[in-house]
């Protein structure tokens, strides 16, 4: 599987004032919900869907999040937030 990384045109960070992760870009900012933030936090260029799923399943003590992760990553790719290597 391909590794996933953030588009370098976006800056991913925790925004204390909003108490959430955000993506900053020249035209503005996108506030992310907790799930989106957790997934994008793992898109470091060394993780694929399987690794992200394993990490989040262990963290949140659930069986499988592959479908939810995949749906989000499709949307993130469509918005050009991520790329596959």
Q: What is the predicted function of each stretch?
A:
Residues 29-85:
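Long, charge-rich, low-complexity alpha-helical segments
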Residues 1-41, 60:
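Acidic, low-complexity/disordered tracts enriched in E/D and polar residues
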